[in-house]
Amino acid sequence: MMTKNDRPRVALVIGSGSVKCAAALGLMKVLEREHIDVDMVVGCSGGAIYASLIALGWPVQRAIDTTLKMWTRDVTAKRNTRAILQLALPWIFKFDESFGLINDRMINRRFRDGFEGATFAQTRIPLFVTATDLYNGEQVVISEGV
């Protein structure tokens, strides 16, 4: 039998795609059933949400229940009208750090509640979240903080 030090390291990388990234929970169910440990989790955009749930070490069913509470029709149906104007008329409605097609106030509230205030410090598996710096367009890797 392989010890943890002998076995290959496993990194689970979850790309972007909004709630479609929840498919990663199905993969986690299989990994859990087969007793395959994940050594690090990486997520981008919607994938960062599920990477975070996995990195916290929550059982898959708890992550599924949290997903069902966070992603409801009232959250996904909210549109940011100003953002549509910013896309259509960028020379009048300038882009800034508040740009987003979906109004994020409700989403942020749901995520704070869903994650129960968890931070990177509480993850059981190392977590890396990739993002884009809006000021210079460069990739940023976040692995600590709130």
What do these predicted regions represent?
Residues 110-114:
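Helix-loop "lid/cap" segments that line or gate small-molecule binding pockets
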Residues 73-78, 115-126:
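A short alpha-helix-loop-beta-strand transition element characteristic
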Residues 6-109, 141-146:
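Patatin-like phospholipase
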Residues 1-5:
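N-terminal low-complexity/intrinsically disordered extensions
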Residues 119-146:
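Active-site gating loop/helix substructures
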